Swiss-Prot record:
<dbReference type="InterPro" id="IPR001533">
    <property type="entry name" value="Pterin_deHydtase"/>
</dbReference>
<comment type="similarity">
    <text>Belongs to the pterin-4-alpha-carbinolamine dehydratase family.</text>
</comment>
<dbReference type="InterPro" id="IPR036428">
    <property type="entry name" value="PCD_sf"/>
</dbReference>
<dbReference type="InterPro" id="IPR050376">
    <property type="entry name" value="Pterin-4-alpha-carb_dehyd"/>
</dbReference>
<protein>
    <recommendedName>
        <fullName>Putative pterin-4-alpha-carbinolamine dehydratase</fullName>
        <ecNumber>4.2.1.96</ecNumber>
    </recommendedName>
</protein>
<dbReference type="GO" id="GO:0008124">
    <property type="term" value="F:4-alpha-hydroxytetrahydrobiopterin dehydratase activity"/>
</dbReference>
<dbReference type="Pfam" id="PF01329">
    <property type="entry name" value="Pterin_4a"/>
</dbReference>
<keyword id="KW-0456">Lyase</keyword>
<dbReference type="GO" id="GO:0006729">
    <property type="term" value="P:tetrahydrobiopterin biosynthetic process"/>
</dbReference>
């Protein structure tokens, strides 16, 4: 997986899902993230903790900005002191390399 992020390659109908044989490798690169499945669709998610709602909202907006740059958007749930970010590629109904690259970007925003 490259750290270079293309424009939403995962949004193309012919985009390939992550090879199941590579899934563990990609997950190991974002160790705080967990694999989930909803209605047969694989996703990755992580809960980020904050001291208050304002910091959680600031993080949400930063993640939203990077999503807009690429035109690839996560599910964001913002609560007092917590943000859950969930990535998957809607068009292909599963995980693409881009989802893991975007998870890495979220980590960079959180750790900045």
């Amino acid at each position: 997986m490259s750290d270079t992020i293309p424009s939403c390659e995962a949004c193309r109908p012919d985009a390939e899902k992550v090879d199941p044989a590579k899934l563990e490798k990609y997950l190991s690169q974002v160790p705080e993230w967990r694999l989930e499945e909803r209605n047969g669709v694989q996703m990755i998610s992580r809960d980020y903790k904050f001291k208050n709602f304002a910091l959680a909202l600031e993080f949400t907006n930063k993640v939203g900005a990077i999503a807009e740059e690429i035109n690839h958007h996560p599910e964001l749930v913002t609560e007092w002191g917590k943000v859950r970010v969930t990535w998957w590629s809607h068009t292909i109904k599963g995980l693409h390399e881009l989802d893991f690259a975007m998870a890495k970007r979220c980590e960079a925003v959180f750790n900045a």
